[in-house]
């Protein structure tokens, strides 16, 4: 981002976040994440808003946002899923952070201008920094997708759907078996696509009701997130690349 590359290096013994100058690799800053993060797998989010560019890192036991220029901590949230994999993303001008492991599966929706410890609770799921949150509803491997008014999450064989603005639950339903969602969900043309490691692609009609409309056999497992470009959806299976109009 603007001649910066940011790397998350969350080795449990010596975790750190480092920013390098993209043009020559010079280290611009480095911050220790000791006692901040033991595990983190997702790609950091870089988001620019109101003159501040922040780096949001999903992690456990803390989700933390840093100032891209200095590495200074901006805001943090404690105690999500203990093996966070989904990458943070922006929709509706807010930052969505999701995890699900170790008995916890939160969704946090954060205002970019948040500062300090903004950890929500069961009794107070929103605050000055958090638009809404739920302690049960996140996904383990798959990064969700916001499409229209709703956020869709693939968690193993379950599809979860919430109103993306209010957090109101729309549905939590099982896909036709077998199904296990590793890849991130994608959406286009009024449809949600959930690629399964059980050699199929489940297609749902977008909206607040659970409406599966197809289960397409692919012949091979799918672990990679589908890509959509110029009216074509691309699926990378374990052995093939498939393009469908």
Please give the residue ranges for each predicted region.
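Extracytoplasmic beta-rich repeat domains
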Residues: 1, 10-14, 30-52, 58-60, ...
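Conserved core beta-strand positions within WD40 beta-propeller blades
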Residues: 4, 53-54, 94, 150, ...
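Short loop/turn segments that connect beta-strands within beta-propeller blades
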Residues: 21-24, 67-71, 111-115, 163-167, ...
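Loop/turn residues immediately N-terminal
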Residues: 13, 61-63, 102-103, 157-159, ...
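Loop/turn-rich, solvent-exposed surfaces of beta-rich toroidal or solenoidal domains
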Residues: 134-206
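Blade-level signature of beta-propeller repeat domains, shared across WD40, Kelch, NHL, RCC1
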Residues: 107, 198-200, 206, 220-245
